[in-house]
């Protein structure tokens, strides 16, 4: 049985948690991984080699003086708790076992035509547009899976399922 579920405040709570948490933890955790793995590459070298235009414009500013302060990260972690509460409330009120939605709102774009994309008549950043459906559940740390769902205009599409916290 399919039930429409409302998630009021989801996008706002996710916006407050998403990039601050992901970017802070990327710098902290990737630096530690590269050091422990002894691969002979630094985080600065890795970042310098990023080729995707939408990511290359984002990551270098996180190093050195552009590093995110711990206080911003802690504020984002508080927003993450609001995000988790929104999901918990939605699952409790609706009684559903999973939320079902398209993995992405668009199919892939050709390399070179993908720095920005258009969705519903609005042009926006590629990265944010493609993660908008899966980002909130990921940030809330709820279990999720994406399954192949066929092709659209010859390109693969997926259907995603997110479950309540602890249901994995």
Please provide the spans of the model-predicted regions.
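Short, functional N-terminal and low-complexity linear motifs
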Residues: 1, 12-16, 53-57, 99-104, ...
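Short alpha-helical interface elements
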Residues: 19-21, 27, 54-62, 112-116, ...
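Short helix-loop capping/hinge segments that flank enzyme active sites or metal/cofactor-binding pockets
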Residues: 24-85, 106, 148-156
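Gly/Ser-rich, acidic/histidine-flanked active-site/gating loops
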Residues: 1-39
């Amino acid at each position: 049985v399919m039930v429409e579920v409302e998630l009021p405040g989801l996008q706002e709570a996710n916006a407050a948690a998403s990039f601050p948490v992901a970017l802070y933890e990327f710098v902290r955790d990737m630096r530690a991984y590269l050091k422990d793995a002894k691969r002979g590459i630094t985080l600065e070298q890795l970042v310098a080699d990023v080729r995707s235009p939408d990511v290359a414009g984002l990551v270098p500013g996180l190093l050195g003086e552009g590093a995110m302060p711990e206080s911003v990260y802690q504020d984002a972690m508080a927003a993450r708790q609001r995000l988790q509460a929104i999901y918990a409330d939605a699952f409790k009120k609706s009684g559903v076992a999973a939320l079902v939605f398209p993995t992405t709102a668009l199919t892939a774009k050709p390399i070179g035509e993908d720095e920005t994309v258009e969705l519903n008549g609005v042009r926006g950043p590629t990265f944010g547009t493609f993660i908008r459906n899966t980002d909130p559940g990921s940030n809330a740390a709820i279990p999720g899976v994406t399954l192949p769902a066929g092709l659209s205009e010859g390109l693969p599409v997926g259907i995603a399922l997110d479950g309540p916290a602890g249901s994995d």
